[in-house]
């Protein structure tokens, strides 16, 4: 049995009783990485020397100062490689940032460091978080621990795979259109996209600034709540972070959902959703009914426009955000330039991968003078309609529930030839980002040995309710206890 089969609160108790040390936890992480990393390939950079030194420092602190410390104290964590870490290489899985060492920490890293968490390393992802399979990484292919011939999802594929494989007890990811929830579903773990503004984006390398959110990927709902508790809250360094009180999320995990009203959008169980996935969700709803909740079918009529809206808006924002990677200040610079303009052009042509180039071109086109109103402005108007759909449903219901993804994990290489089939994989998660509301994916079944995710969506800043529902479901089932046979 691995130490990481325990919940974080249980590991915390073992530390308090001196039955294990912080060094034991870090050793366990690197031991497991040594066993499975060659197969899974979740990490881009390991932080072994610093992690072991910090573990020793925290063990000394424990010996001198006793047990008065938070639940994350001494816990190993993996960090998605688009969150800047002072002195630890941050690449966004892109050749253009292959040698970038940040000189400051993201706000979430400062908060984790203050809580005593220990960074084990930086995790693989789709380049600049653009993708749904982690196949767009500029460096390596991460594999799904449940089936090494399949993708782990994306763009936070490294984060989900590392947690599922037991390399770390938890990890941070980022979610722009499903990039935490979709890989969490594919890898059979718990992934939360918080409300937009709940967690500071300062130090998150921007893809689409109006959509990006950092969030936790964990083995259990309780662990997820502990991690969000530490990273959530107002940050003066991020003008979009919200001045909304952060409740005690763990206290919300009462197991009581009697009288809870669930909305199930017919659009989320219709065309394109695999029958076995649909059945897993209907079975999950029966479990929630037994626990005292009720559900009704509703409509989110503008969801069918979400995919097109998202790709116009996200690509437009990416076009602007990625203009800073020009070879002048940091990162990759071409050796073949004849002049300054040529240097910009060659650096970006050689440094960016195909998917990033595709989205930059799409966004630049959508923002161009003759097409701005027809594409970008119209997409913003449709985004408002999508948001209003959610607001209308939430007037009557507490949460919205459906599948996280239309299918379980697909085979490596299966969708790389056709960007549109790849994009369609996020069709159920994208509306949540456009509306800015929180959503969580929890394991709810298996299809041919592959995990299926249940998506629970809540009102703005009401992560507590979706945690309560997710936890009640988790405690009534044992899907979260299943582990891949690595």
Curated annotation (Swiss-Prot):
It comes from Geobacillus sp. (strain WCH70). GO terms for cellular component: glutamyl-tRNA(Gln) amidotransferase complex. The active site is at residues 80, 155, 179. One of its GO terms (biological process) is translation. This is Glutamyl-tRNA(Gln) amidotransferase subunit A. The gene is gatA. Belongs to the amidase family. GatA subfamily. The keyword ATP-binding applies. Keywords: ATP-binding, Ligase, Nucleotide-binding, Protein biosynthesis. GO terms for molecular function: ATP binding; glutaminyl-tRNA synthase (glutamine-hydrolyzing) activity. The lineage of its organism: Bacteria, Bacillati, Bacillota, Bacilli, Bacillales.
